[in-house]
């Protein structure tokens, strides 16, 4: 499945993350996982999900980075690039971003509406079951990897600690769909 938004998302991700081969490998793995969910959504929503999979880490690109909080920076870019509100909100709120924004004292996510919970759960599932190298991984292993990369005082570490149960609940909800 490759709709117009997904194709545009791929071009943006491959261009803007070109110098970050590890991150791009992860993004490609997330896209592969997201394509599994296409049959559960209408064509437009499925296209938005795959586009968001391509774009969920675009906020790490130097050309996009503004605040240093990749979900917010990415969502602002996605909105300004005309990908639509669903894609922007998925990028904004993916994988526990609301908890991390709170840990960072950022309020910028309030500019975005909450995406449908099932679509957000699907993107979160895909992100949490794809390792940093793009290979499938258990959500527990992925979260352990994130915790190991960030010290206990880092907002990422604190957010994963605080949001772990909800993140794993999203993964469980989506496993039933597969």
Pin down the residues of each PLM region.
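His-Asp-centered metal-binding catalytic motifs of divalent-metal-dependent phosphohydrolases/nucleases
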Residues: 46-78, 88-98, 127
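Short glycine/proline-rich turn/loop motifs
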Residues: 10-14
């Amino acid at each position: 499945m490759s709709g117009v938004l997904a194709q545009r998302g791929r071009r943006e991700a491959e261009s803007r993350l070109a110098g970050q081969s590890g991150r791009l490998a992860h993004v490609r793995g997330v896209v592969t996982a997201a394509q599994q969910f296409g049959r559960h959504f209408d064509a437009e929503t499925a296209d938005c999900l795959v586009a968001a999979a391509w774009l969920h880490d675009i906020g790490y690109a130097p050309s996009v980075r503004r605040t240093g909080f990749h979900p917010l920076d990415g969502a602002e870019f996605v909105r300004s690039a005309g990908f639509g509100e669903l894609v922007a909100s998925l990028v904004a709120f993916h994988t526990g971003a609301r908890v991390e924004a709170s840990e960072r004292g950022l309020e910028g996510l309030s500019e975005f509406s909450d995406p449908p919970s099932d679509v957000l759960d699907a993107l979160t599932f895909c992100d949490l079951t794809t390792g940093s190298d793009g290979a499938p991984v258990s959500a527990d292993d992925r979260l352990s990897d994130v915790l190991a990369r960030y010290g206990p005082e880092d907002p990422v570490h604190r957010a994963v600690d605080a949001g772990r149960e909800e993140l794993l609940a999203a993964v469980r909800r989506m496993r039933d769909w597969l």
